[in-house]
Amino acid sequence: MNKQNNYSDDSIQVLEGLEAVRKRPGMYIGSTDKRGLHHLVYEIVDNSVDEVLNGYGNEIDVTINKDGSISIEDNGRGMPTGIHKSGKPTVEVIFTVLHAGGKFGQGGYKTSGGLHGVGASVVNALSEWLEVEIHRDGNIYHQSFKNGGSPSSGLVKKGKTKKTGTKVTFKPDDTIFKASTSFNFDVLSERLQESAFLLKNLKITLNDLRSGKERQEHYHYEEGIKEFVSYVNEGKEVLHDVATFSGEANGIEVDVAFQYNDQYSESILSFVNNVRTKDGGTHEVGFKTAMTRVFNDYARRINELKTKDKNLDGNDIREGLTAVVSVRIPEELLQFEGQTKSKLGTSEARSAVDSVVADKLPFYLEEKGQLSKSLVKKAIKAQQAREAARKAREDARSGKKNKRKDTLLSGKLTPAQSKNTEKNELYLVEGDSAGGSAKLGRDRKFQAILPLRGKVINTEKARLEDIFKNEEINTIIHTIGAGVGTDFKIEDSNYNRVIIMTDADTDGAHIQVLLLTFFFKYMKPLVQAGRVFIALPPLYKLEKGKGKTKRVEYAWTDEELNKLQKELGKGFTLQRYKGLGEMNPEQLWETTMNPETRTLIRVQVEDEVRSSKRVTTLMGDKVQPRREWIEKHVEFGMQEDQSILDNSEVQVLENDQFDEEEI
């Protein structure tokens, strides 16, 4: 990496003030829920990663302190400690002025993932207090801030040092983050581990010093993204060792690693300057284009594709592919589409990645002849399966559509009266008896009921062609009406919310997992948009008195049950619901379907890698990883009258508020 750029006081540019951050924090960190809270940490970590990315330092330590504050320390050059050209100490400018950072105008960095300095000021604005300690030029400097960014001390020289680097410690402001200011070790772990995978020489340590939560993890991967791909494919049956390519074109550094497994879906993770581009972009397009072209050329060369045969589609070639595409782009070329950094727009990145892959992949295919031939045959089978699936989809959308759809849905779907797709809800209900109660108890205007009678297929282990043959899944696809797989278009959905409602037992939980697996793999935008929910029917009904003095209460947890038992005193009757069918329509409406009183869990995908690995663990072919996960996470010996919601990680929110449960 180029080290000629001078990271000094004059390289920090000031663009605008910081006044609006506390008034509208969502504009700067996305939200003030747990995502926004953890985003604060990433802003500071990204600054440290930028140092490593540009060749300065190789260690980052993140520590959750006993008091709930968090420290991020690196061994980079240390922030500039002189006087800025604006007349203020540079450290104060970095932490109190928005858009004051080393990125702007390429003052201090050749490549940068974050907006260096921007993050620091936003974090300061949203903190109860913040302290920075700098080791630079043989001296230790310290400055502190409080109450959302006001300096509580000047930049003070504390002593001598032989080290270099920056340490930032802050405590999030609980008047901004009202839900919680408690950091989640596992959430931080995923992001930090990702950074370590992407930079071979980077060592990251994550510590938790909180009482009862003491824990430490180290992340250092000498083989970089090669190990990243292996990590993503854990628990899957892989077809070969991880392949890696590196190169440079147009001043852009390109690193690619890939490995095929025996599954039917692809997983491509792309990064720009160590920042995940969740929506892909030009670098991902370059990778896919080159893969498709090279594989087709190879297939024709070995005569698996004849002259009359049409080319293999990229989707067929990528079936079962796991890949990581990482590019490093100079600041002057870096462009993103839209307001977020989730999609790369740099046109040069497409040709750079295409060039590197097109240069290296043919040699790999020739060298691994037997494997390459089997991958081509795998793609041809995928093409045949896709054609079969396409015909099934055309059946659903062609002239036969209405007749077949009516046949599929007759006697099953009880539709909503309204055609307002922005308000309508679809309840997927376990069993006929509960479906009957739900039909009678629902609000006919906007709630549709689809009872699930047969077996739902495990879509983790099935091709799309076979999924179409499963009556329950096929009915769900027709009912939602937005397509499936790569053809799924969320804007065509007939429903704003899809709510899974099952019994609170192991069979019900299994149906939930099967449905969530399907939605995650084949209707992912629906999950990503937060439009898939799990209904939480109560576990207990308590009744006391008669006539006008009669009192009926419901409990969703054992804790609520104990509280109500004490409140009601002696003489009440207790019913434990073992199934939805035990509730009459009025009770089902009141407890589980009425937006004013019901409790729902919103299913969210916070980290795609972690979610995908969890689905593979729970729903894949390998028994041992599933057994290990269950032994670690499930507490056995639960009595019949105990609640599955005893898990302290699940927070129940009422009155149509949503607990965000990650799959």
From Swiss-Prot:
Its cofactor is Mg(2+); Mn(2+); Ca(2+). Residues 386-416 are annotated as: Disordered. Keywords: ATP-binding, DNA-binding, Isomerase, Magnesium, Metal-binding, Nucleotide-binding, Topoisomerase. Pfam families: DNA_gyraseB (PF00204), DNA_gyraseB_C (PF00986), HATPase_c (PF02518), Toprim (PF01751). GO terms for cellular component: chromosome. PROSITE patterns: TOPOISOMERASE_II (PS00177), TOPRIM (PS50880). One of its GO terms (molecular function) is metal ion binding. Heterotetramer composed of ParC and ParE. Topoisomerase IV is essential for chromosome segregation. It relaxes supercoiled DNA. Performs the decatenation events required during the replication of a circular DNA molecule. HAMAP family: ParE_type2. Belongs to the type II topoisomerase family. ParE type 2 subfamily. This is DNA topoisomerase 4 subunit B.
